[in-house]
Structures are given as structure tokens and as C-alpha cells.
Amino acid sequence: MAQFDVYENPNSGSKEIYPFMLNVETDQLGVLDTTVVVPLCRLETLKKPARHLNPVFTVQEEMYCMLTQQISGISNKNLGHTVTNLSSCRSEILAALDFLITAV
């Protein structure tokens, strides 16, 4: 598991709304059985993303919005296959997390 990996959401109850989960946890905690993720939803689902809180990324040729306000810890067993890595968007991801916590 790598920081900023995007995983399929295998949960049949939520994968239609949140098809992907973004791993935001540092690689240095890879020994844990859990990880911290932020769900991604299709841009059209959210309608109007908050400017600093909900950055938009391309995953599998579609636009997805990071729902930073829904950050959570989950078991690694609850993640599907890795589909991409968003390390190239590191600044936007960290800025959204920082805004959630400090509003800066």
C-alpha cells in the first residue's frame, strides 16, 4: 500500500456513490492493519465542490472529487484493487487535508 494509491471500493452498499478510496496515510505506517482513506465520488455527484476542501482528479479518464470531509480509517481488507496513484497531485491532496483541520 502506498500513500496516494487509489483503490476500488468493493463495498456493494457504497461503491455506486463512492467508487474509489484514496489512501492518504504515510507509507511509514504500512505495518498497521488499517489505513486512512478519503472517498472519491464522481464530480457530477457533488455538483459544486468546495474550492479548497474538494479537489478534483482524473481517475480512469473520469473526473472525481475528493470528499475530504469524509476522511476515515478502515481495515486494509476493505480495499479493492489499486487503480492508480495520485502522487502527482500531492500538493492538492495535502492542501485539502490541511484546510479540513486548520482552515488554512
Task: Enumerate the language-model features and the residues they cover.
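Residue-level detector of secondary-structure boundary/capping sites
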Residues: 12, 48, 84-88
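Short amphipathic alpha-helical segments, especially helix-boundary/capping motifs
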Residues: 1-2, 30, 70-74
